[in-house]
Amino acid sequence: MNKILVIVSFVFISFLSCTGLTDRQRLANQILSDTNLLKVDSMARATIRSGFNAGSGYSQIWARDMNTFIEVACEESDPHELREAILLFFALQQPNDEMIDGYVLKEDFTWYDDTPYYSDVAPKHVAFKNTVETDQESSLIHIVGKYIRKTGDRGILDEVVAGKTVLERMNLMVDYLMRERYNKEYGLLYGAMTADWGDVQPNDDFGCDMNDLSDPAIDVYDNAMFVIALDYLLEMAPDSSQAPRWRSLREGIAKNVRTHLWDEKRQKFIPHIYPEESPIPEGFDELAIHYHGGTAIAIEAGLLSKAEIRTVNARMLENVRLSGMPSIGLTLYPVYPDGFFRGGMSKPYVYQNGGDWTWFGGRMIQQLVVNGMVEEAYAEICPMIERVIKNDGFYEWYGKGGIPSGSGNFKGSAGVLSKAIVLLRDWAEKNKG
């Protein structure tokens, strides 16, 4: 009889213990018990161990891509090879101080590009740059900042490449942006008109080089990336003689983003300011478009309040519902009209014109966790996790109906998901019942 009482008492106490868990503890336990998260993280790390190129179908090493898997690469790749891959970017920095998009061995330079980049100190490689964008310099600064955070290798800042240290070269990249891509009227960086963070412009068959067909445009993505880059410079070299300038630039860019690009009434960023002519066809309201990727980077840059983050996230979810796309990786909504871009992007919900990219959706998940919105982050990452398992790979982007497209093992997608999973599980470990 006493044994029965003891057992019943134990069960009752256990029941009270389980039901006494807080919502936070239940969520933490659910995250920690989700084997799909562990599976996808393992898959991501295996993908990134295969090299520093952007993914299957890409022979090139891109700065904007490496920026999103560098932290995982620091844990999974050969440290010397990773360091050398980073330094090679600086070897290919151009005489005008601009940074390239990426590089490849000369024998693998097999595509059409009428403006290849070369350097005497990197004789085996050829570089390339989609000049419609203005994120290359910022992306490489992010890479170095993240690399130092993960490895503690501050010596890379003093590494001399072609007569200048890495830190000096990064400061020269800031000089280049302020000299060549800074609009004085608005106090912001500009590039050519593209779809949010994209690197393809309309009105041009090739679409990747700034030229006479380009429409200069100011957007939140380029400027948020620059704000983050300046934060990294201040973190890496707080005692530099350039630190006061970096701090002043950071404050000015952040203020001007809020002044000129934030639409207070609609609680969203406007897509573009056009200092010259607008390419938008009559009758189409570009101001109604929500740029999901640029917004995620703006959150990372600290440009939105917690209340605003909740608002834009709710809007992203509504845009996903209205569009019928799979996840908040949806690049933008509403999409640009049929035929506005050329080639494949001329159709809505294709590639950067409304395709669904884990590469940016995963970064939004990261920011939700960082800003304490873990329940939302976990719910919103699930469609991305499920499609990796279903399709056995990290596809570059997804079209209508969740159809996988582009590179089948896109390392940017793998990197952002792995980091998001680590953030979720770290939070869960601290809050479990």
What role is predicted for each listed range?
Residues 252-257, 302-313, 319, 323-327, ...:
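Long, repeat-rich segments with strong aromatic
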Residues 23-45, 61-62, 99-105, 178-191, ...:
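Catalytic cores of carbohydrate-active enzymes
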